[in-house]
Amino acid sequence: MRIRVTLYSEFKKYAPGSGSGPFDLNLPPGASLLYCFNHLKIPVNNEFTALINGRRASLYSLFREGDSLVVFPLICGG
């Protein structure tokens, strides 16, 4: 299944390739946010906020085809 991922601030370094802008990620059906973090090598001990389709997610939230994931640190300024 394919999801759209956007990483902000210190999390951008975990994006494949250039790390600039959103990217598509293929995951197995029923994958969780924890699986996604492990796949991208994002340490789970980082303080973060994750939104799936605009709703707050936990590490055990499950993805569905076409979902959108946004990850940013708890404190992030513009």
State what each model feature region is.
Residues M1-G77:
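Ubiquitin-like/PB1-type beta-grasp interaction modules and other compact soluble beta-rich domains
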